[in-house]
């Protein structure tokens, strides 16, 4: 389940932030950005599922350049940035069907994708930053809304306060399988599609 989402450089979103509850209703007039929010979730889900960035972009509506925020006529943002805070299942299954319990169930995932020209003079898409870490209680605004008596139902108690970095491509530091991390992200995003209701307002 997604608890917080920040988007920058995707379609109409510029430093856009939204917090989610177990049931969230998105209401607004036509062309207010509701569809763009679901398009962003769709892109995030595909990016977590596939290894080919271009494939994930091509599956979206329109040309890939149109997914970047248009700043002026024929001028588009160079980067798309996502920041997702999520509550994931307490167990994860790997590619071989093995299950393992998770120590941390509240995570923050950050992803930055940039447009750049490759050596052949063709515009390409590259991941310039990818970061996944656990959220401490003090950093998790969503968990502050949960009554203390039911807090353990949402996230297990962790006695250590040391932050664990699960993915950090900027430092080329890998402390767990990228497959599992992306699968957790994908599960959280897919779960969000069932808990968010979109409504048109006249």
Model-predicted segments: where are they?
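Electropositive, glycine-dotted interaction segments
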Residues: 95-202
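Conserved lysine of the Walker
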Residues: 34
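Solvent-exposed residues in well-ordered beta-strands and their adjoining turns
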Residues: 8, 21, 85-89, 112-116, ...
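Hydrophobic anchor at the beta1->P-loop junction of P-loop NTPases
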Residues: 26-28
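N-terminal pre-Walker A segment at the start of P-loop NTPase domains
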Residues: 1-14
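Conserved P-loop NTP-binding catalytic core
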Residues: 39-108, 115-118
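Phosphate-binding P-loop
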Residues: 15-21
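A structural signal for the main folded, soluble domain(s) of proteins
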Residues: 6, 22-23, 156
């Amino acid at each position: 389940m997604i608890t917080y989402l920040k988007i920058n450089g995707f379609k109409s979103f510029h430093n856009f932030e939204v917090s989610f509850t177990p049931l969230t209703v998105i209401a607004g007039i036509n062309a207010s950005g509701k569809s763009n929010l679901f398009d962003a979730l769709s892109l995030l889900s595909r990016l977590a599922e596939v290894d080919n960035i271009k494939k994930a972009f091509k599956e979206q509506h329109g040309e890939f350049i149109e997914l970047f925020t248009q700043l002026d006529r024929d001028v588009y943002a160079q980067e798309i940035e996502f920041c997702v805070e999520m509550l994931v299942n307490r167990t994860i299954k790997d590619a071989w069907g093995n299950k393992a319990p998770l120590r941390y169930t509240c995570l923050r995932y950050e992803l930055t994708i940039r447009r750049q020209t490759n050596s052949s003079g063709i515009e390409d898409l590259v991941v310039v930053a990818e970061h996944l870490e656990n959220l401490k209680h003090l950093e998790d605004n969503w968990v502050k809304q949960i009554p203390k008596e039911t807090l353990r139902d949402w996230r297990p108690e962790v006695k250590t306060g040391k932050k664990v970095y699960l993915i950090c491509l900027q430092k080329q530091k890998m402390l767990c399988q990228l497959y599992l991390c992306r699968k957790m992200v994908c599960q959280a995003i897919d779960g969000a599609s069932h808990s968010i209701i979109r409504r048109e307002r006249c």
